[in-house]
From Swiss-Prot:
Entry-linked PANTHER family: ALPHA-L-IDURONIDASE (PTHR12631), BETA-XYLOSIDASE-LIKE PROTEIN-RELATED (PTHR12631:SF10)
Protein name: Beta-xylosidase
Pathway field: Glycan degradation; xylan degradation
Superkingdom to which the source organism belongs: Bacteria
Biological source species: Thermoanaerobacterium saccharolyticum
Length: 500
């Protein structure tokens, strides 16, 4: 039995930096109906502020084209699709966190590509044309959306240049050249636009030290530092899936802390630090993303991550995503909070539960967060991620919660292996790759948390709450004041109803 007495007052604040940004598949996917419908659903339930994805300058979005006029090759900038995409984002109420990349093929110095959709990852063959392209894009955004709006958009240069898959030869010197040219082009458009990088993945934090030293020594603009984070080890690959061991959540939080210290010890100690991608695994084919384990595991990251970073962006909001080809089945290990056919995964509800939290942080430990909201109500989240196979994964809790009203209404929402787990039901169905409409409806129905309510009375300003958390459970308790209007019903007597 784990016993906790929550204090009645705290001067600590719970940060909502966890919902600053969310990741997306390549921007061209935003032209699909299901993508936009899913983004609306996620925005309504979780209220992310920004969205970040690859492919702004890739050929499917179509911004960079070339026309041959006599003996001259002239660039042509086509904003038809990006206008549709960014218009949709802003209409939904979410702003772009703009990743500048990858390389348009007509401007590329080589043919190396990444992903099924062939994003070119080579440097520009003409840095002057690249600079002109960046400036043209920024001028267009400002013309269409206004400078006050565009000044709110961060501009991140490239994606994971420390990996050969994402930047030819993982050439640090060449990336710094790209960054310098791009950052100066952005500042030439407007010196108040925010630009940053290097957007590396884990295992290469020396890049951040080198990057900040380079910016200082070369007088290159930098307004924020960005990095990615996952906690999976090398895996066992199959043609359709990958299985990886996931390290404890402390590993990711320590990565956040480490980079924050690097920044503090640099020539730019006060720079904002954004984790622009994070998840358990770096592969969109790892079934862990579909599970209640993922939901329980991510809870601690949401609870504590904001202590160390200015934002951390979950990768991604939807399984409408095509890095390794078009998805081959309903559940396939995709990154998304929401599976194909708009079926919310357990991790979606972890985020939704955190969206119910208040600002006053009354209590926090490695498996629980208790907050008070502006109206005096209290919200508690607890989780029980089970890292290893065990015969007795359950945890019993007894929590004394301070409440500022005697009559209490409790709403409890629970996800675990048996509740809010459409992946489990899909397995029961026989893992249909392309489920029927009836099967999709069933999966949507079982994706919802279990909800229970009660009406206890608080004594001496405290309520004693007892509960059990099973394997990979995440629970949300909301304690609000109960307003009883029963006396307004003339002749009310429930005992006259048969069986009551």
């Amino acid at each position: 039995m784990i016993k906790v007495r929550v204090p009645d007052f705290s001067d600590k604040k719970f940060s909502d930096r966890w919902r600053y940004c969310v990741g997306t598949g390549r921007l061209g996917l935003a032209l699909q109906k299901e993508y936009i419908e899913t983004l609306k659903y996620v925005k309504e339930n979780i209220d992310f502020k920004y969205i970040r994805g690859h492919g702004l300058l890739c050929d499917d979005v179509g911004i960079y084209r070339e026309d041959v006029v006599g003996d001259e090759v002239k660039p042509f900038y086509n904003f038809t699709y990006i206008d549709r995409i960014f218009d949709s984002f802003l209409e939904i109420g979410i702003r772009p966190f703009v990743e500048i990349g990858f390389m348009p093929k007509k401007l590329a110095s080589g043919t190396q590509t990444v992903f099924y959709w062939e994003g070119n990852v080579t440097p520009p063959k003409d840095y002057e044309k690249w600079s002109d392209l960046v400036k043209a894009v920024l001028h267009h955004f400002i013309s269409r959306y206004g400078i006050e709006e565009v000044l709110k958009w961060p501009f991140e240069i490239w994606n994971e240049p420390n990996l050969k898959e994402f930047w030819k030869d993982a050439d640090e010197k060449e990336y710094f050249k790209l960054y310098k040219v791009t950052a100066k082009a952005i500042k030439e458009v407007n010196e108040n636009l925010k630009v940053g990088g290097p957007a590396i993945c884990g295992g290469a934090d020396y890049w951040i030290e080198d990057f900040l030293n380079f910016c200082y020594e070369e007088n290159v603009p930098v307004d924020f530092v960005s990095r990615h984070a996952t906690t999976s080890k090398q895996g066992e690959y199959t043609p359709h899936l990958i299985y990886q061991e996931i390290m404890p959540s402390e590993y990711m939080l320590n990565e956040f802390k480490t980079v924050r210290e690097i920044i503090k010890n640099s020539h730019f100690p006060n720079l904002p630090f954004h984790i622009t991608e994070y998840n358990t695994s770096y592969s969109p084919q790892n079934p862990v993303h579909d599970t209640p384990f993922n939901a329980a595991y991510i809870a601690r990251i949401l609870s504590e991550g904001g202590d160390y970073v200015d934002s951390f962006s979950y990768w991604t909001f939807s399984d409408v995503f095509e890095e390794r080809d078009v998805p081959r089945s309903q559940f396939h290990g995709g990154f998304g909070l929401v599976a194909l056919n708009m079926i919310p995964k357990p991790t979606f509800y972890t985020f939704k539960f955190f969206n119910a939290m208040g600002e006053e942080m009354l209590y926090r430990d490695e498996h629980m967060l208790v907050t008070r909201r502006d109206d005096g109500s209290v919200a508690l989240i607890a989780w029980n991620e089970v890292m290893d196979k065990t015969e007795n994964p359950d945890e019993d809790y007894e929590v004394e919660i301070p409440v500022r009203f005697r009559d209490v209404f409790i709403k409890r929402q629970l996800i675990d292996e048996e509740h809010g787990n459409p992946w489990g039901t899909w397995i029961h169905m026989g893992r249909p790759r392309y489920p029927s409409k009836e099967q999709v409806n069933t999966l949507r129905e079982v994706a919802k948390p279990e909800i229970m309510t009660s009406q206890p009375v608080a004594n001496d300003g405290y309520l004693n709450l007892k509960f059990k958390l099973g394997k990979n459970a995440v629970v949300l308790y909301e304690l609000t004041e109960r307003i009883d209007e029963s006396s307004t019903y003339i002749g009310l007597d429930d005992s006259k109803i048969n069986g009551y």
